[in-house]
Amino acid sequence: MLQIIYRLPFLWIASLILVLAQPTLCQAKMVSVELVWNLGQAGWVQIDIEKGDYQLSMDTVTRKFPAGSTLQVGWGGWTPVLRINHEEFQIFSGSVLEIKGINSGSLRVKTPEGKEAAYRGGLQLNWQDGHWRLVNQVDSEDYLKGVVPIEMSNEWAKGGSEALKAQAVAARTYLVKQTDNGSKMITDSPDIHQAYAGMSVEGEASKAIEATRGEIIVDAQTEQPIDALYSSHSGGYAEDAKNVWGNTDIHNVSHPDPYSQGVGGAVNYWRFIVSAPLLGSKFGLGPVRDVKLDKFPSGRVKSVKLEDEFGQTATVKGRAFVQAFYPFGQPIRKEAFLGSFFEAQAVVKSDSHGISDSAGLFGSFGYSGFLELARPNQQEQGPLLSKVLSSSLGTSAAPQPFGVFIFEGRGWGHGVGMSQWGAYHMAQLGYKYQEIIAYYYNHVSISKG
């Protein structure tokens, strides 16, 4: 609470600076977004024109492509083929197909695997290395309508609209920074750039984009766009950019973030359990007997030193350690390893009787699936953990004579810049988006076109 009170004057002064900053022009423009998140390496694709008027360009040939038109592209014997409006398939001898928008509309992309999404703007299809490369060409403000709802949530408009506005400004700034650096294209992947899902996720967040149209975050002195970084949940402490990527950034510095405490459900507090043998096998060791953490001032783990039962050691960078257990492609839950803000605790073996949970660590956290393990005698207190593999893999048929390790953590993501859950909490407390931006980014102002 003292931290919150301490920062309130700063928020008021910083927000005043943001409001009084001299506006500069940030025009909407067309951007090219490569669709790699769900449509990368596509072999067969169908594009349906849902609304508007388009034209289909195939090298030197152009034809009208109005609403109701369909294009199917695929390959046969490593040769690209296409079919227009359910006509006969034909071999495509060129390398680029382009569906250009004449009037505003929308098109839907489908794959045989059941993946589909609707997009504004046009679509370019390139045949490369035995697959189709899809690029959505869309107005930058329309692009944001497919970013903000999936980076945050349309549901946050109820009581958290100022957070959506802050996200819109940050996402717009990120886009400007990426494209102004000479890159002509970004991707729709959150692992590479920022998440983008087209029209399929549009909703209440569009109002936040319209309300902040053209606004970006710039350096207070140079008025150049900053790296407006953000992640889901800071765990209660924003990280310094140099501790994650090695580059000093005066706009993204470490500081306490009490607004991210107590919110976020599973990402606010999580616990991951793994057996000593499985932990060691991930890093070329035998069953681990000791874990030592080297931390940054924020509390995030810089590196992990592991020692196994044979005296062998390995030191792993914090991010690499997280990636070894991160639940890629799985729903986020509190029994997962979600970030580098964590503590480690060993539960050692109990003589000849295996490993017991006398403290009730599993039961209190909902690991009911681990509580059915047989006990060697009735006097053993608590369920045995000797059959546990990990929180994600469950148990094995045979027990192991070594311990298990419990990793308890906070937050989700790299923690640099704006915490999305923290921004949402601030909005719920009545802060405006300018104040949210001033809190999470250092030495900035907002430019408005």
Segments the model singles out, each with a brief description of its role:
Residues 2-449:
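Conserved, single-site charged/polar hotspot
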